[in-house]
UniProtKB/Swiss-Prot annotation:
The keyword Cytoplasm applies. Transmembrane segments: none annotated. This is Tubulin gamma-2 chain. It is found in: Cytoplasm, Cytoskeleton, Microtubule organizing center; Cytoplasm; Nucleus; Cytoplasm, Cell cortex. InterPro entries: Gamma_tubulin, Tub_FtsZ_C, Tubulin, Tubulin/FtsZ-like_C, Tubulin/FtsZ_2-layer-sand-dom, Tubulin/FtsZ_GTPase_sf, Tubulin_C, Tubulin_CS. It comes from Arabidopsis thaliana. The gene is TUBG2.
Amino acid sequence: MPREIITLQVGQCGNQIGMEFWKQLCLEHGISKDGILEDFATQGGDRKDVFFYQADDQHYIPRALLIDLEPRVINGIQNGEYRNLYNHENIFLSDHGGGAGNNWASGYHQGKGVEEEIMDMIDREADGSDSLEGFVLCHSIAGGTGSGMGSYLLETLNDRYSKKLVQTYSVFPNQMETSDVVVQPYNSLLTLKRLTLNADCVVVLDNTALNRIAVERLHLTNPTFAQTNSLVSTVMSASTTTLRYPGYMNNDLVGLLASLIPTPRCHFLMTGYTPLTVERQANVIRKTTVLDVMRRLLQTKNIMVSSYARNKEASQAKYISILNIIQGEVDPTQVHESLQRIRERKLVNFIDWGPASIQVALSKKSPYVQTSHRVSGLMLASHTSIRHLFSRCLSQYDKLRKKQAFLDNYRKFPMFADNDLSEFDESRDIIESLVDEYKACESPDYIKWGMEDPGQLMTGEGNASGVADPKLAF
């Protein structure tokens, strides 16, 4: 029985990475740009209905909502070659089309204004599912629509569909370059609060690291957004292969996440992928074995979060959990041997209070997509060094807040009216508490953490540490 997943693409970035994701899924399942099954797509064994449903004329339609407050990207999709793929009733554009002006408060406020309209769309999609498992939100945390409206949707989904899983693919801004969004630290902090309290799993897509990988690994001198987005769609499609080509394990989202997220607050995942190739790029042909792929996944240069192992404290940083999704022609005995070799060489430093094991899910490769390598792998990992990414967000926020810079843009909206900036302070406290929790994970006493000092427990709807999230219980 399919466990359907509804995808919400919010804002410019969310719609761009969402579009790439659907292109990739169409290729892998043999679905044409118009949603019609290709003549050659005769092999069964895949579950298209997790992400698609069939219209009366048998063509496949993504279970997706395209939401934006300014029309440019969605108009591009509606006039592009995949225009007939989507259900046009599931496209929401703001009436005035002015966008959110890179202001979280504007996106959040406008989200509140159109809540009924968007929730109607979501309810309609949910009613059309036999056994809805959850939602996937694609967005960025730095702008206005993806961050503000995305935050509002996360809160609303939590209220309306409290038993359903919510996973996000969240794009973090490039912190090596000066941003064209000066209020990025404010937007990021306010969104991070919602990602901490209202999401069950956040896959962190860090633009800093994606750019670095594009330059170092793909030898692109000046990577375009389209090229980094294709890296993102590779990760998104690989992370859903076990749902779309089901085996006996990890064939639904709960199963996939339950092992990765032992405590509810530490639900931010980093990813690694190998071997990487981008179209039009000279492919390096090499022998890909399971051991080679699994070893490469642990190398810092393949990991798509920049904070990882690039600072003096990295030696204390530890893995909380690892799931490797290996695609291709794989013999399970090779997996066992590879895990043994990795253990013998002590290539991985795990936390002391949990099972020190790399989990492996084997998955079929799409028969319709030709690749030059036999085996490819995606790593989804929870690692304590992710806290440095949050610490950097905090320090950038503190710099701006100290100068009281650009706060007038926020005071125009009801949440910050009458100079009430408590939302910022509360968000900061929650992210600081999250950083502390990841640091505490590195010590063997973590299980007792937060028990003695009630002040360390989270405000709002968040779970206290050590309390299992009922949605992730089997």
